A protein has these predicted regions:
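Start-transfer (signal-anchor) and selected internal transmembrane alpha helices
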Residues: 1-31, 211, 440-441, 448-455
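Membrane-interface anchor segments at the N-terminal boundary of transmembrane helices
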Residues: 9-11, 85-94, 314-392
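Extracytoplasmic catalytic/substrate-binding loops of multi-pass membrane glycan-assembly enzymes
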Residues: 30-52, 63-76, 82-85, 295-296
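Loop-to-helix entry region of an early transmembrane alpha helix in multi-pass inner-membrane enzymes
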Residues: 67-75, 82-100, 120, 135
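Transmembrane-helix motifs of polytopic, lipid-linked glycan transferases
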Residues: 89-113, 151
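Membrane-interface transmembrane helices that cradle and orient dolichyl/undecaprenyl
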Residues: 152-168, 200
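Membrane-interface alpha helices of multi-pass inner-membrane proteins
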Residues: 168-182, 213-220
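Membrane-proximal stem/loop segments at transmembrane-domain junctions that anchor or position
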Residues: 229-337
Length: 455
């Protein structure tokens, strides 16, 4: 418990209360609801049915590894015997471990006791926000993805502060779990691998950077290959949705794809702004066969070329829709639909951990970034730690853009990991700013965090 806030007994009590709240919510969602003793308020939608059906297949089969989603959640479902109550309890327990690990790691890299408390409590309150907690009661990939994200960030911070084989091994293992939980996660891992290779030019970082870069690239390539091996490929319907909802709703984009072979006719004119995956004639009807052929043969290539040749559109459109990044309140709709939205104390605590106002979150981002950059420039924050926090925030933005461009359907849900990652970065940055102010101007030796000085 080195580096925990003092008094340590109080910190342990906070962690205990957090665990009770998370697991208590899981038990309630899994065992009570709708007026019956056994009537689970578990989020179970079309994706859930596909995941549980694929989880029946043998682990090494193509149907399992290249199924309807990345196989990480399918493996969890199989280990839980595809029992929805067991899945809720297990992924909630994993969430407790992951969030506590991240919160205590953040506390351990602070020097002042005040900053340790702010970092730890802020992270735990974020985990209790209704828009985050509700996913523990859903039969989807979000909860496991967030737990993997917490593990990646915690091991990453530990690796930056005190490089060691154990931290490196933990970081690589967490990257694997993260990459094989959601397809957009694999893209983020691939980007991280490229940065790791760039860091390998520094002699002191060469070995860990090469290990992270090689492993991350292998995970990203493997996850992408499995996604492409699915039938249809997992990019197929997202590209179709994006074409119908976004590209055909924009005159300029429509002209571009028509010039690149899109079968524009009277039937295609009915597609703009429609969620075509839910429209049976588009999925199977003969009148839309040309559209399905175009998506499979040319769709992904043409869409990618459009983004590359129209960077203004590619950057501006997600920015205009940035509420999906800065607003964690809208996503609570899923909890209301399945009647399992955490209320009461969770709403109060969540308002602190993840403020509901997008405007407030944007202002918090700007103020924290300016203060953090200034103190890092004055070397009041350890350079390696400052770089790590900047990467966390930067990859949150990249993750949001990848989610927005990756699928036009359920953007708030697909951008959840990026939105949570942004708030984690904000809490770490805020704690580090307070830490630097509380400590005041110091010598180089005091830049070592508590977890290192205690050794």
């Amino acid at each position: 418990m080195s580096g925990w806030p003092r008094p340590r007994g109080a910190a342990a009590s906070v962690v205990g209360v957090f665990a009770v709240l998370v697991l208590g919510y899981a038990v309630w969602a899994a065992s009570a609801g709708h007026g019956r003793v056994l009537g689970p308020r578990v989020g179970y939608g079309p994706d859930s049915a596909l995941y549980l059906a694929a989880a029946r297949a043998p682990v090494w089969s193509r149907r399992f590894l290249a199924g309807p989603g990345a196989f990480g959640f399918l493996l969890l479902a199989k280990l839980c015997a595809r029992n929805v109550r067991a899945i809720v309890i297990v992924q909630s327990a994993l969430a407790v471990v992951a969030w506590v690990f991240l919160a205590t790691t953040v506390a351990s890299v602070m020097r002042s006791n005040l900053a340790r408390w702010i970092g730890m409590v802020g992270i735990l309150c974020l985990a209790l926000a209704p828009g985050v907690l509700e996913w523990n009661a859903m039969i989807t990939t979000e909860s496991l993805s967030l737990s993997a994200l917490c593990a990646v960030l915690a091991f990453g911070l530990r690796l930056v502060v005190r490089p060691a084989r154990r931290e490196l091994a933990g970081f690589v293992a967490a990257l694997a779990l993260f990459a094989f939980t959601r397809d957009t996660n694999a893209l983020v891992v691939g980007g991280l691998a490229l940065i790791a290779f760039a860091c390998a030019f520094r002699r002191a970082l060469r070995v860990p950077a090469l290990v992270v870069g090689t492993a991350g690239l292998a995970f990203a390539v493997t996850a992408t290959a499995l996604s492409n091996a699915a039938e249809p490929p997992r990019w197929y319907w997202p590209v179709a949705e994006t074409t119908g909802v976004r590209l055909l709703a924009d005159p300029g984009a429509t002209r571009y794809i028509v010039d690149h072979g899109f079968p524009w006719d009277a039937q295609m004119r009915t597609l703009p702004e429609r969620y075509i995956y839910l429209y049976d004639p588009v999925r199977t009807g003969a009148q839309f066969a040309a559209f399905r052929h175009w998506v499979r043969v040319d769709g992904r290539r043409v869409y990618g070329e459009y983004l590359l040749t129209h960077p203004g559109w590619a950057l501006r459109k997600p920015f205009d829709a940035r509420d999906a990044f800065f607003d964690l309140g809208t996503i609570e709709l899923y909890g209301r639909v399945y009647r399992n939205r955490p209320g009461g104390v969770f709403t109060v605590v969540g308002t602190f951990g993840a403020p509901r106002s997008p405007g407030f979150t944007e202002a918090w981002t700007v103020v924290a970034a300016v203060a953090f950059a200034f103190l890092a420039w004055r070397r009041r924050i350890r350079p390696a730690l400052a770089a790590a926090v900047a990467l966390i925030a930067g990859f949150a933005v990249i993750g949001y853009y990848a989610a927005w461009h990756g699928d036009a359907l359920e953007v708030y849900r697909h951008a959840l990991s990026a939105a949570v990652q942004l708030r984690i970065a904000l809490w770490i940055a805020t704690a580090l700013v307070i830490d630097a102010i509380a400590i005041g101007p110091t010598g180089t030796e005091t830049l070592e965090p508590a977890s290192v000085r205690a050794v």
